[in-house]
Amino acid sequence: MQRALYDPVDPQLLGSLAPDLQFRVNGEVYRFGDEKTLRRFMQEPELWCGLLRDPVNGSRFRPSTRSPRVYFVGGPYYFASDSTRDRFLDDPGRYEVKRAL
């Protein structure tokens, strides 16, 4: 079985392994086929990232432009509630998701 990773903004493009065509949201790595789709994703990640896991309580949710968020170590973190965002800010190293690029 062949598996390919597609660009989340333009599924016609294959995601690149190049470090300059990658972006993190909640610690998850997203890969892009070109700079244009990467820039578009970075402007509004909540439109393209799909379901996320709140790094504090593990709940799954679909972020929106109104979702609580903070920027930490290379990308945005979205939260299911203000209370989990506040807990994250109290000790971000504890909740940071670490994934290798």
What does each model-found stretch correspond to?
Residues 7-10, 23, 54-57:
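Short cysteine-rich clusters marking metal-coordination/redox-active sites
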Residues 14, 61:
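Cys/His-rich microdomains that often coordinate metals
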Residues 15, 38-41, 84-89, 95-97:
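Short loop/beta submotifs within extracellular cysteine-rich repeat domains
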Residues 19-25, 66-72:
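Short cysteine/histidine-rich zinc-coordinating motifs and their immediately flanking basic loops
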Residues 27-49:
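Short, structured interface segments
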Residues 31-32, 78-80:
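Hydrophobic core segments of beta-strands in well-ordered, beta-rich domains
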